[in-house]
From Swiss-Prot:
Cofactor: pyridoxal 5'-phosphate
Keyword Transferase listed: yes
Lineage: Bacteria, Pseudomonadati, Pseudomonadota, Alphaproteobacteria, Sphingomonadales
GO biological process, one term: L-histidine biosynthetic process
Gene: hisC
Family: Belongs to the class-II pyridoxal-phosphate-dependent aminotransferase family. Histidinol-phosphate aminotransferase subfamily.
Broad EC category: transferase
Known catalytic reactions: L-histidinol phosphate + 2-oxoglutarate = 3-(imidazol-4-yl)-2-oxopropyl phosphate + L-glutamate
This protein's name: Histidinol-phosphate aminotransferase
Molecular function terms from GO: histidinol-phosphate transaminase activity; pyridoxal phosphate binding
EC code: 2.6.1.9
InterPro entries on file: Aminotransferase_I/II_large, HisP_aminotrans, HistidinolP_aminotransfase, PyrdxlP-dep_Trfase, PyrdxlP-dep_Trfase_major, PyrdxlP-dep_Trfase_small
Length: 372
């Protein structure tokens, strides 16, 4: 009897890729696939600037490639933020830049450091280049600079800090960001992820963009997905020392900002009135919502202080986070339950419209009272 033919070995991924758990985005549907009001992905409840929508609709011929360098968009970003456009690199969302930063500056055997309850993409960014993710302890769900610095070793190559942090909403003031940077060796890249930075009151500016100008080892990333309301276009940007920008430009995807994305982004960044309106709306509704939740403290409901466009709520009483997550679906809302990030006791809820936040707060109150 003839021997069975030997099948060729199948391609095998690198060992470190097998350790990656795929990113889980906020859901859009609930039980049985019903469409719900989505307050799980931190999108802008005011939508998108009318100017950006108009520019997107007249972006040009989709059969043609976009400007590979996004020159006009970089110039507009530079004008608004006082940055030399040559020191700006564009990304397909800031996620691309976070991954590229790890890829460019870390590799097998190196360490990538971030705080517990940091953005889940940091773990993926570290593992996809073969580096070891190192998680520093938190301080009551916030960033502890001393704990981060204590975790630095001779193998540390990249430190990620989201400010404000996702999913906790915590924020480090300028002095603490500067202290973190001062405590790092100059050969360690500090990535300051400012996806939610535009939601900060200008008086609370954390100094990240200033550090990007003066330091040789700082990369600041920003996104158009949050306050600009352009999540569907996937536009991110970063700034830092020219050598860092050069490295990221070498390995980013070509034509990585679409024709419509460049047109919409250009109009959006010039419409700072929309940005300010979004910031005011968010601050007002967040304060109202948190106040209603704090009134439920005797039921074990604890909203964490937030400087972002969401609130992380801890449920430490009879009603669990899972109870509320499922219960809010019956009211027509999908929120973000976070057991996969070590927060089974917490829900992250995006700040929506006034009516939405009032209805959610009332629903949580009803659930708590029913559990007594």
């Amino acid at each position: 009897m003839a021997n069975a033919p030997q099948l060729p070995a199948s391609p095998q991924p690198k060992d470190w890729i097998l350790g990656i758990h795929a990113y889980v985005p906020g859901k859009s549907t609930g039980k049985d696939g019903q469409v719900l009001t989505k307050l799980s992905a931190n999108e802008n409840p005011l939508g998108t600037s009318a100017a950006a929508l108009e520019a997107r609709a007249h972006a040009g011929d989709p059969a043609r490639y976009p400007d590979p360098d996004s020159k006009d968009l970089r110039a507009a970003i530079g004008e608004v933020h006082g940055i030399d456009p040559s020191r700006i690199v564009m990304g397909t969302g800031s996620d691309e830049l976070l991954n590229l930063a790890a890829q460019a500056y870390a590799g097998p055997g190196d360490e990538v450091l971030y705080v517990r309850y940091g953005f889940s993409v940091y773990d993926i960014a570290a593992r996809r280049c073969g580096a070891v993710p190192v998680v520093a302890p938190d301080a009551d769900y916030g960033t502890d600079v001393d704990a981060l610095l204590a975790c630095v070793t001779e193998r540390t190559r990249v430190v990620f800090l989201a400010n404000p942090n996702n999913p906790t909403g915590s924020w480090l003031p300028r002095e603490e960001v500067a202290r973190l940077h001062a405590g790092l060796r100059s050969d360690i890249l500090l990535v300051l992820d400012g996806a939610y930075a535009e939601y900060l009151d200008p008086a609370n500016d954390d100094g990240a963009l200033d550090l990007a100008v003066t330091a040789c080892n700082v990369l600041v990333t920003r996104t158009f997905s949050k306050i600009y309301g352009l999540a569907g276009e996937r536009i991110g940007w970063g700034t830092g020392h020219p050598a860092i920008v050069d490295m990221l430009n070498r390995i980013r995807g070509p034509f990585n900002i679409s024709l419509t994305g460049q047109a919409a982004g250009l109009a959006a960044v010039r419409d700072q009135a929309f940005v300010e309106a979004s910031r005011r709306h968010n601050a007002h509704q967040r304060t109202r919502f948190v106040g209603k939740l704090e009134a439920l403290g005797n039921h074990g409901v604890r909203p964490l202080p937030s400087q972002a466009n969401f609130v992380l709520i801890l449920f430490e009483g009879k009603v669990t986070a899972e109870d509320v997550y499922l219960g809010l679906m019956d009211y027509g809302y999908i929120t973000r339950w976070l057991p996969g990030q070590g927060l089974p006791q917490a829900l992250r809820i995006t700040i929506g419209t006034e009516a939405q936040m009032d209805e959610i707060a009332d629903a949580i109150r009803r659930m708590c009272e029913a559990a007594r």
